[in-house]
Amino acid sequence: MPHNPFSVKTPTFLLSAFLAGALLAASQAAPPDNSREAKAVIQAALADFDAKKYDDALAKLRALDAKMPDDPFVQNLIGAAYTKKKDYAAAQKYFDKSLEKSPDFFPAKFNVGELFFLQRNYPEALKHFRQMQQQDPQNELLQFKAFLCLLQLGNKEEAAKALKGIKYPGDTPAWYYGQAAWASKNGDNKKAIGYVTGAHYIFGPKTALFDETFDDLGINLR
């Protein structure tokens, strides 16, 4: 992961982006350029993400990329913006660029899997997230995404095993949303809502990524 010489103040679970996953992954590291200008551009672009002004974010980030063409963080953020615009081909291009510069950069690696997930290519998404789990088996987000892939594929037996593997109590809302997804899939929305409500109470804004993932899947519990 690239060195982080200064802090960009963004919530750990901003995404989507995932966040449809993209912003969560994007916010886990800062660019190596420590200039005030670069920091200001990043913060302004993230504010555009919050306001759903993705074209504005892209304009800022593309200009910054022209000045910092080898920066995997900036390239990952550009990919995140294209993801939000559902331009998945462009998003893939920038995630690949990010990984060319930093092959182990978790945010970009995660977002590649998220592209498969958003396009309903659950077999490839599952393969990708499981490969990432080999390097980080206790990562709750990866556990959650792999579980959802199995659930969407109708493999309930394997999904149940994956759900049991999600840490409780954990550092993220993954366990709660995993339980909610399982309950919803089995027709018990009342129970599912209870899990989501509990997650909101405990984790606050850290639930944003998980809520967006449910929205992407058409799981409406709010």
How does the language model describe each region?
Residues 77, 111, 145-146, 178:
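Canonical tetratricopeptide repeat
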Residues 71, 105, 139, 172-173, ...:
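Residue-level recognition of tetratricopeptide repeat
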Residues 50-51, 84-85, 118-119, 152, ...:
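Register position in tetratricopeptide repeats
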Residues 67, 101-102, 134-135, 166-169, ...:
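Structural marker of alpha-solenoid helical repeat scaffolds
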Residues 74, 108, 142, 175-176, ...:
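TPR alpha-solenoid repeat register
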Residues 63-64, 97-98, 131-132, 165-166, ...:
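Canonical positions in the second alpha-helix
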